[in-house]
């Protein structure tokens, strides 16, 4: 996993609440275990029309959304089933962070495990960003994980919460197993100093 420190990039707004994981990536894409290529299924039912051509009205298909690395969406993002393919697809598409007023717990957890940063913002901040994006679809944001802040287009900074363990793992580019392996020497030393009684029963 690549370390996550500061993310500066173009944002795109998908102003929909309660986007579930089936809308993020349909079930037929879940047979694969390789993350690469999952971008093709991201928001597939919305990105494409019945004849398979791109839907020009879908926010991600608009020219101004090209190269966006930050997705802004409505509350309860990632609800529904626990499929880990949802954050995989978002990351494979090129997103490094998702901003929303709230996230489904399992989606949030799955995202943190792969280095996709879920940033919880106040509803008022979300509403402001939606309005700003409508006026300037080239809107850029900066997310600083170390200070847990999002720098808005006008320079103001807003704070976002994240637990200490997830923050450490993201900053150092390690997953849960990687963190455990970092503690290997300490674990071995502890076990050596705490011998377990042996029973023959």
UniProtKB/Swiss-Prot annotation:
Catalytic activity, as annotated: (2R,3S)-3-isopropylmalate = (2S)-2-isopropylmalate
GO MF term (any one): 3-isopropylmalate dehydratase activity
GO cellular component, one term: 3-isopropylmalate dehydratase complex
A Pfam family matched in the record: Aconitase_C
Span of the signal peptide: none
Pathway: Amino-acid biosynthesis; L-leucine biosynthesis; L-leucine from 3-methyl-2-oxobutanoate: step 2/4
A single GO BP: L-leucine biosynthetic process
Top-level taxonomic group: Bacteria
EC numbers: 4.2.1.33
Keywords from the named record: Amino-acid biosynthesis, Branched-chain amino acid biosynthesis, Leucine biosynthesis, Lyase
EC top class named in words: lyase
Purpose: Catalyzes the isomerization between 2-isopropylmalate and 3-isopropylmalate, via the formation of 2-isopropylmaleate.
HAMAP family according to UniProt: LeuD_type1
Subunit structure, interactors included: Heterodimer of LeuC and LeuD.
Database matches in PANTHER family: 3-ISOPROPYLMALATE DEHYDRATASE SMALL SUBUNIT, 3-ISOPROPYLMALATE DEHYDRATASE SMALL SUBUNIT 2-RELATED-RELATED
Protein name stated in the entry: 3-isopropylmalate dehydratase small subunit
Protein's organism: Chloroflexus aurantiacus (strain ATCC 29366 / DSM 635 / J-10-fl)
